[in-house]
Amino acid sequence: MKFVGHLMCVVAATQFAAVAIAAGAKRPDLTGMYGPDVKTIGVPLISSVVPKAKFMEISNRLVKAGYRLKVAPNVLESKVASVERRKQLLEDMWMDPEVDLLVFARGGQGAVDVVEKLDWEKLKKRNMRVIGFSDLTMLVNSMLAKGVGHPMTGPVLTTLCYSNKAAVNRMRDMMNGCPKDVKLCVVKGADKPVEGLAMGGLLDRLHRLTLKGWLPDATGRIIFIENTNKYASRTDEMLGCMLEKGVFKKAAAVVICDFNSKQPKEATRKKLEEFAAKIPCPVFSGFPYGHIPNTSIIDFRRKLTISPDGTLSWAQGK
């Protein structure tokens, strides 16, 4: 199986240098963002077609930051590859000994079809770190449910294009093992600190995982939820379904991230308070994660603690 290698990526990226500059010359420096042990980033695609100019811009920046990219052949194709081909390319890249980290080219839609067919026994043989987002909520939570790899949710490459300096610094801290505290708003408090491991992502995809029975066991976990305006009208339906299925029954806490941001703030606040009243665990809001420039990486294998006043602290170290 052949991939687009480092040299081809550099050449292709230089063709789009003008696009990168026009899009904003003062983009955050990405040097060291993925930690000292990441030299080669594998870039797979299991969902929608990639916006090429945006992809080449971020590729250019990553190469300038010192990373080597291995890009799956379907990333720059103009049509979505077959499910079987997307599956095979992902599995091959996962098992490639040169690849230190997988960061998907984009989210979009279509990941569910690939996730359903993955050879999990094969993937268990390599503890690959994977960063997925949005539609890839389907993959990273399925990894957690299957006990495969090291799942994280955070910006895919086309999302990283518009991540701001604060976001990049926060992601760099996480990937280097020194994430800083984040102060959250308390929607429904607790008498003592809550602690656990994270799970979560885009509400629509968490809802789909629930319906399919693929959602990881949330017992003792802290569930992070974002919701884009595209799905705002279905918020009650999706949360209601997850409530009915008992998703939140034994969770340690729920953290609301970017949520219906273009809806009236008072209406969103009321909706979250109504939701919090229906579940037994504490609920917090205001974590910077979602389809926003000021986003974060959430590491599903890193323990975190939330104090009664809403201070979220991650465990330190690699």
Task: Locate each region found by the language model.
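Bacterial N-terminal signal peptides
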Residues: 8-18
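Short internal beta-strands
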Residues: 71-73, 132, 251-258, 284-286
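Internal helical hairpin/lid segments
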Residues: 214-268
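ATP/nucleoside-binding phosphotransfer catalytic cores, i.e., glycine-rich phosphate-binding loops
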Residues: 258-318
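Conserved anion/nucleotide-ligand pocket segment
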Residues: 149-211
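Short Gly/Thr/Asp-enriched flexible loops that form oxyanion-binding sites at enzyme active sites
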Residues: 107-125, 141, 269
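ATP/NTP phosphate-donor binding region
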Residues: 23-98
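Short, acidic/small-residue loops that bind anionic groups at enzyme active sites
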Residues: 120-142, 150-157, 282
